[in-house]
Amino acid sequence: MTRVRQSLNRLSYLYYKAKESDEALDTESQNAVETLEKVVKAIYELQKKPPGDANSFFNLAGYHGEPFQGQGTTDPNWWGGYCHHANVLFPTWHRMYLLRYEDAMRTVPGCEDVALPFWDECELDQDKKPMPIPEVLTREKFRLDGQDIPNPLFSYKLQKELKHEVDGAAHRYSKPLDYQTVRYPRSGLVGNAWDRLATRSQNADYAHHDWCTILLNRNVSSWLQGNIKITPDGIKETRIADTTSVLGRYNYCLDASTYTIFSNVTSQKNAPIDIFPSPTSLESPHNAIHLAVGGFYQPGAYNANEIPGANGDMGDNETASFDPIFFFHHCFVDYVFWLWQRRHGSTTKLEIDPNDPGAVLQEGVGNMPPKTKLSMDTDLQPFKKTAQLYWKSKDLVNIEEIEGNHGYKYGPGSLDHLASPRKPVASPIRGPEKGDDKVKKVKKITVNRAVHRGSFVIRMFAKPPGKRELIEIGREPVLSRWDVEECDNCRDKLDVHLLVPLTGGMLDYLGGDDRGEKITYLGAVQAYGQMDFTANLQDMVHDAAAENLQDVHPSAVKLVQDVALPLR
């Protein structure tokens, strides 16, 4: 029977409502209670299995990143995990990963028909604001079979240490036995003495669970809406254009014209930009949620939505999958993937552009060396279909007809109304009377990942002529490794870009160009406590952000520049 993946938001809401009520349960509520208890029981049992068990949570989580395998154990030119990011296999590899995890859940007695729910990240409340993270993902305890147990959906305690031994990485992602995964605003960096000291201080400041849950929900909501609140010294609070919000990115990625562009950030950056909104890949909002849940450093911020020193496990590829929320997040990502397929008539076939840079491995993965060509026939290691064969992307195109009793469907979700193609959307920033949605120019920031350790965010600002304010017009979260600077292939190949298309309406709103006045554009990289603006700042802006400037790296952020249209 085809398994159905339901909204965890709905299941969690009905479950806790039922537990707090003395009234008889209706059918939907009773089913929700039974379904959620099966999900919790299955994951709880997987977490209790010894690490060497093929179906243990430790083993399954370890497929993604740590513990590293093969050449990637020490060689920074290789990725020591099996996951695919920034290439065309990102959606399909993670689709297979979820199936493997779900299959393991189904080995637990009494859970043979369980399906993994999805955290519906785009669900809005009656005020059109993002819903909080489902309560079952943030409670410390869960009552199962008459006993209160450590909630296996909230955190996981390592049953075996993780040794991060990549050359030049300073053991940053090493974790001891019994390490407990954490989320924003806490830190889980304990691999070396400096990180342990910083983490001890950070977590002492955020020791109260309920308060941390409030801060986590606020932070995720801020990312989803595109609201950013930073130090008011010359940079005023501003709502970011919808295309830079995570809600907007999830919406706009459904307009990507090809699977190649839709699938990953590398191909997204190579796509032509001649319309608004610009092409967005599924991987882009996916990255942002990782950073929102795991945390990243916001220097000088007064708002609790962005707290310095927050470095939870979801913020890094190496350890993200050990946080149980990872799988519910990726289940939503797969829901959006399937929605894109339905929207574009691609439920039975997906095509990869073999000439696209996203169809080539940038660093070695598994036993595939750098520069390996990727296709729908590439093995999705380590997932075995038979004793001799691996699953391939072409096996997973139609989710309802995957062989071997692996077919599944999605229950109702917040983006179901986008299953049909829509007309082009007008620019969210328009002139006072008439909006011009034609792209007039594109601005670009290029950042070398090797210069910045770990994950970071590229940000772009515009300063209207004659004004003291900076308006943020674009941002791109980059989910990255700590040890990229030791990777020869990464240094040579892995520049990342933020591209911001500017329509006539946006330029009119900013008050320049067509009026003969000059708009100033500035770039910034925000990561691990530093706000690195571009070189040659005007004194006014430099003074306004002086508190946040610790180092300026002109080689890391190139001055925002015009880009010719169309981009290729």
What does each model-identified segment do?
Residues 1-568:
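C-terminal accessory segments of proteins
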